Amino acid sequence: MRIIGMRFCCFLLVLIFRVSFVSSEQPRASDPSQIPAIPQPPITFQPDPSGAVPQAQFRELLRYAQDREVENEKRLRDYTYVEREEEHKLDGSGNVKKTETRTREVLQVYGEEVERLIAKDDKPLSDAESKKEEEKIQKVINKYKNESESSRRKRLEKEEKERQEERKFVLEIADAFNFRLVGSETLDGRETWVIEGEPRAGYEPKERSTKILSKFKGRVWIDKTEGQWVRLDITAIDSISVGWFLARIHKGMHIEAEQTKINDEVWLPKHVAVRVDARLALLKSYNEDVDETFRDYKKFRTESKITAVGETQ
């Protein structure tokens, strides 16, 4: 989660149904060969006598997709990429009144994801702005280059605790919804199952954070061969208050997400589109369309360490 407000709402929705961009991961192996090979999924739906697919089979498939995301998260740390965010600010009638774009290069610095702004409104930064971004990255590099062992241990323990909390949230997704097989569809040349999910009546959340699951419905497209999610379509079916009314997400908020296979080894984000309709601290309204694209994935050596901006060893 990068900043509060509108981005918080986007992050929250992505977390709920993407099964999941931010699901649990274990500490990264220093050698990609140490990451276990992904087994082929046993995706063979067996309808019951009435012709319906039992819920247990859907949940097995979705949990399998969640496990694949653990591997995706590990491998993502071996990549840099470019993210372009386009924000359309809307008036009360839904018409665009202002458009802004930000393009960022996303780097991995001592295991931390760090963003460097490289363009605004599709125009390169000025020399002064570029220098400021370079100084920001160098500050992060210096911080972790000189990090003590005890500080590093505390940082990793904190990150692991956060991952475990995220994992608890994600694990409830398969239990909190009733699923229906809509059919099959070809996306980017790949055959997918199309599965629809709606809140399960009477479900009792195990975690306080998962109470909001009943406020959403959606569809997920899952690759038949690899069990990876390919596309998501999520809608808020009720208004949601977040964090002691610090934010309120309105009914009808909508998000679409896509991911794609990179280097024949990992599935990573391709596109996210969000219709934001929310109010922050009961005062400031956010009525925006946000469109994010992810490109130029480049793999770097896992043993490399960035010791200065533009340098590795």
How would you describe each model-predicted region?
Residues 9-20:
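Bacterial N-terminal signal peptides
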Residues 26-217, 224-230, 235-253, 258-270, ...:
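Structured extracytoplasmic
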